[in-house]
């Protein structure tokens, strides 16, 4: 079955959703050889993954993972990684601001991919216990209004592809599946992608997956976040409808910066950056976090404008509510 699928892909034929799900199920159940997995991933990459193929793979990952079942809508803010720019942890720091503003956040993440410090690495040096069971994560989400979902804890089937992915050393469909496979089935998502050509296709996949509202973003400087150093392309998902547009920092009264001002470092260095921002330090890093947070608040709160959400995000920092949310989260991660 996998051999037939590889044959079709090599001949530049697209797979149906059902056929792709069959192949993905076989891989995620450990029923494919390393050679078959490598051939499937490489040929798919060379052909170019379709919206249907990405949708099918994301569906299987969602089915196979350990799940959270919150009684309320949650938001995720996450990037694909792979932009190779080594920026600081914009989405992770934003999550404390968003949660402090009353939006439940189920942050899905892992250790470093494209930088020296992934979301898990930063949270760990901040003092968060990241190795929690799904039951503990669900309890913390209910108690604190946010949780961290460690990818390796929730997606155990990924062990069947880990060795092949590492040996291949190229981007594959799995680089974009992580943000699409939140174990809490986030209804609201801000997803950053490393390639502008992925913006609208990923938005279409989110429609297929039933997400209520989402923003898929790509900075023209290459960033898989909303950037302050250039224009950002956005495709908005709003209950099945798509709307693509561009934003610039100047539209929101923010000063454009150089990309070098957004570069991060080691986990310890990024810890210092995070605490400086949450303690009120001004500058490009703060403004970038504020803008990404504001877009998430805008998605969740239908009755607010983006500029109002920008002021709310700024207030979450200046009032120390975001810093207090971090402290609350750290404490809960060790007590639950």
Swiss-Prot record:
Q: Is GTP-binding found in the keyword set? A: no
Q: Where does anthranilate 1 bind?
A: 79, 110
Q: Which reaction does it catalyse?
A: N-(5-phospho-beta-D-ribosyl)anthranilate + diphosphate = 5-phospho-alpha-D-ribose 1-diphosphate + anthranilate
**A molecular function (GO) term:** anthranilate phosphoribosyltransferase activity
Any Pfam family the entry gives = Glycos_trans_3N
Q: Can you quote a single GO CC term?
A: cytosol
Q: What class of enzyme is it?
A: transferase
Q: Which amino acid positions bind Mg(2+) 2, per UniProt?
A: 224-225
Pathway annotation: Amino-acid biosynthesis; L-tryptophan biosynthesis; L-tryptophan from chorismate: step 2/5
Q: Which residues form the signal peptide?
A: none
**Cofactor section:** Mg(2+)
Q: Where does Mg(2+) 1 bind?
A: 91, 225
Keywords of the record: Amino-acid biosynthesis, Aromatic amino acid biosynthesis, Glycosyltransferase, Magnesium, Metal-binding, Transferase, Tryptophan biosynthesis
Q: How is this protein organized at the quaternary level?
A: Homodimer.
Q: What does this protein do?
A: Catalyzes the transfer of the phosphoribosyl group of 5-phosphorylribose-1-pyrophosphate (PRPP) to anthranilate to yield N-(5'-phosphoribosyl)-anthranilate (PRA).
Name of the protein = Anthranilate phosphoribosyltransferase
Q: Which organism is it from?
A: Endomicrobium trichonymphae
């Amino acid at each position: 079955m996998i051999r037939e699928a590889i044959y079709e892909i090599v001949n530049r034929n697209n797979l149906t959703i059902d056929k792709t799900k069959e192949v993905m199920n076989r891989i995620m159940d450990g029923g494919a050889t390393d050679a078959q997995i490598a051939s499937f991933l490489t040929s798919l990459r060379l052909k170019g993954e379709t919206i249907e193929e990405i949708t099918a793979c994301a569906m299987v990952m969602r089915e196979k993972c350990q799940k959270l079942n919150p009684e309320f809508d949650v938001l995720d803010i996450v990037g694909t990684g792979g932009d190779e720019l080594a920026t600081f942890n914009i989405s992770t720091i934003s999550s404390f601001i968003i949660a402090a503003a009353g939006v439940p956040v189920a942050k899905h993440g892992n250790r470093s991919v494209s930088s020296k410090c992934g979301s898990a690495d930063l949270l760990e040096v901040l003092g968060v216990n990241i190795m929690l069971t799904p039951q503990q994560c669900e309890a913390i989400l209910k108690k604190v209004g946010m949780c961290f979902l460690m990818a390796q804890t929730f997606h155990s089937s990924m062990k069947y592809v880990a060795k092949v992915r590492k040996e291949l050393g190229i981007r594959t469909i799995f680089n974009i599946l992580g943000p699409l496979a939140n174990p809490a089935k986030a209804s609201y998502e801000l997803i950053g992608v490393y390639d502008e050509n992925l913006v609208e296709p990923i938005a279409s996949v989110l429609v297929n997956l039933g997400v209520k509202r989402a923003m898929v973003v790509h900075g023209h400087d290459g960033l898989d976040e909303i950037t302050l150093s250039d224009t950002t392309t956005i495709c908005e998902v709003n209950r099945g409808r798509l709307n693509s547009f561009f934003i610039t920092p100047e539209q929101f009264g923010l000063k454009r910066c150089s990309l070098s001002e957004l570069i991060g470092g080691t986990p310890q260095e990024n810890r210092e950056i995070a605490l400086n921002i949450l303690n009120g330090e001004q500058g490009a890093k703060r403004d970038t976090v504020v803008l990404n947070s504001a877009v998430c608040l805008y998605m969740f709160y239908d009755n607010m404008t983006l500029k109002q959400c920008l002021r709310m995000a700024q207030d979450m920092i200046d009032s120390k509510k975001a810093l207090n949310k971090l402290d609350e989260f750290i404490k809960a991660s060790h007590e639950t």
